[in-house]
């Protein structure tokens, strides 16, 4: 849901890379009128990506939520109520008061939550109706707040996701000259406002070394 997002090809690429662990037969792309022209481009690209990978995955694009959510195993949410114009307003709210303009916390995050939560709960009501056993994978920001709303006010199984910890792990692995899978980073906090508490590599905490390397690179 929110298929016109530029992040969709990255998600599809992840599905292709993990097709042996997570075999799928169909992907249903969903968007609204405002994002339809972008979603049509994503539809064509998604089909070509699966074809190039040799995977027989059916891909459709729809605005019909019942069609999209009936008998599915996973629902991925990555929409933005109000589109990019709303993001501009959210970030300028904070800037107006001398704070960082951000869409996941602070004034901007709170404003975005006011729009994202009602829309997400509306989607969850349809998930409960048409696919009660499905998992909601929530990328919609502010991810932590939206996910908490789903947990508190619906019966939908949900996981809140953010790519910041993953990007942090990638950067740390480069500093350590290590494989990403061998680096464990313990993080705490809400999405886009997180702290690395420990970096474990080869059985040792490498936090001090990593911090020194990052500080040296930024001097």
Residue spans for each PLM region:
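N-terminal Rossmann-like dinucleotide-binding module
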Residues: 1-22, 30
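Gly/Ser/Thr-rich loops at beta-strand to alpha-helix junctions
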Residues: 4-8, 34-36, 83, 138-146, ...
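Glycine-rich phosphate-binding loop and adjoining beta1-alpha1-beta2 segment
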Residues: 17-54
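Short, surface-exposed basic-aromatic patches at helix termini and helix-loop junctions that form
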Residues: 17-20, 47-51, 129, 148-158, ...
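Rossmann-fold NAD(P)-binding glycine/threonine-rich loop
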Residues: 47, 81-153
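Short acidic low-complexity segments
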Residues: 58-71
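N-terminal Rossmann-like NAD(P) cofactor-binding module of classical short-chain dehydrogenase/reductase
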Residues: 69, 73-79
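Substrate/ligand-engaging "lid" and interaction regions
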Residues: 156-157, 161-219
């Amino acid at each position: 849901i929110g298929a016109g997002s530029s992040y969709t090809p990255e998600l599809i690429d992840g599905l292709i890379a993990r097709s042996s662990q997570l075999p799928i037969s169909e992907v249903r792309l969903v968007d609204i009128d405002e994002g339809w022209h972008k979603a049509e481009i994503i539809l064509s690209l998604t089909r070509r990506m699966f074809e190039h990978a040799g995977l027989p995955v059916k891909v459709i694009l729809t605005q019909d939520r019942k069609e999209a959510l009936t008998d599915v195993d996973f629902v991925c949410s990555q929409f933005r109520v109000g589109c990019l114009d709303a993001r501009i307003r959210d970030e300028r709210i904070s800037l107006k008061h001398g704070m960082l303009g951000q869409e996941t916390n602070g004034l901007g995050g709170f404003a975005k939550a006011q729009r994202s939560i009602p829309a997400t709960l509306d989607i969850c009501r349809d998930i409960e109706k048409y696919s009660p056993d499905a998992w909601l994978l929530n990328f919609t920001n502010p991810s932590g707040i939206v996910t908490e709303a789903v947990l508190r006010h619906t019966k939908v199984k949900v996981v809140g996701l953010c790519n910041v910890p993953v990007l942090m792990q990638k950067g740390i692995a480069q500093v350590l000259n290590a494989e990403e899978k061998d680096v464990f980073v313990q993080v705490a906090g809400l999405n886009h406002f997180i702290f690395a508490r420990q970096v474990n590599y080869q059985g040792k905490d490498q936090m001090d070394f990593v911090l020194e390397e990052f500080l040296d690179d930024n001097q």
